[in-house]
């Protein structure tokens, strides 16, 4: 069965057909790294990591890029408050980000570009928009001419007239039209800045993603994803910038995950009700939070509370217990029983059911229901007077198959993603030191744990084998 996904651009489910057969170019908007991530940041990390896992499970070669915004107003404010420079703060919280999402079972992207490392590409992008007549300079600032782009508003499904009715030019802004948005901001005294054709300054938020997508993935990509709050203006503006420059469809499919509420109230820093991931995982198994997030369809809102997370723990434990019971019965059963084929068919039905749910817009909530049904049948099977090892093995392998996509583990023996990343870094260091014996040893160790490595020009990529 083919994958169908809900495309925000068309507001309907569509059959997934990548631009190039067998390959997927995927970009996910990453965090602004001025603080530890909260659970609202964790949701897209978990959701799109799972989407990537499933695309790979289906045989696609996925090129996955997710950025860091390592310079903007929030970072500058944090730097001033802490008496540190912007690069120091961003580096600290990038490291913390990897620790937090690694604990949640998220693999690193193939590339994690940062704004400060791609300033030349950003400036070049802005310069080309100016030369094509889609942008203009005003006293050191550069603005995008929103009305010059005919398709503006197509992602958020708003007309120019609707947008204009609520737009205002704030005091100090030097733009020609209230709908125009900043591509480049002139430097302010004491702020971090870069040289450009328009004087010292720094980029606007929206241009950063457009420039990095173009640099690392090209003019067109298959999937662009992020939180629902990014639909407008961020993703709308990305489309305008990129399509104005290239004349091509920027992204074929747009995926957006829903909001997170805290105790039935929208999470916001102004209300002081946001919850940091590193606080949660001090008290709970990090995999529990991932399981909790995936128990709701990615487009639906999630209501989070400590009570709900605690309630989820008992459900997660039931899966782990079923899996553990299978492991303990292995090698203590007979070789053949008379109804083996029926049970093997039952196990196979769960693979088909899992794929059917995931093919339908990555419905992890229903996919987890398939896991519980698998656990129920495993428990029934283990209650038999006589069991067969090859049937128990089939149950175990089906559990492993499903949870390898969902990204959590039911057994203690499986390596966490962060442990895999650490081993890969140790192997990379061995290769840099020309210690090929150690490098091969680590590769073989990972292979024995069903971890497949691929060395590319962009670095080492890995996936769990089927």
Swiss-Prot record:
CDD domains: CysRS_core (cd00672)
Domain of life from the UniProt record: Bacteria
GN (gene name): cysS
Organism whose genome encodes this protein: Bacillus subtilis (strain 168)
EC number(s) stated in the UniProt entry for this protein: 6.1.1.16
The name this protein goes by in its record: Cysteine--tRNA ligase
Any one GO biological process: cysteinyl-tRNA aminoacylation
Keyword Transcription regulation: no
Binding positions (Zn(2+)): 29, 209, 234, 238
Coiled-coil annotated residue ranges, if any: none
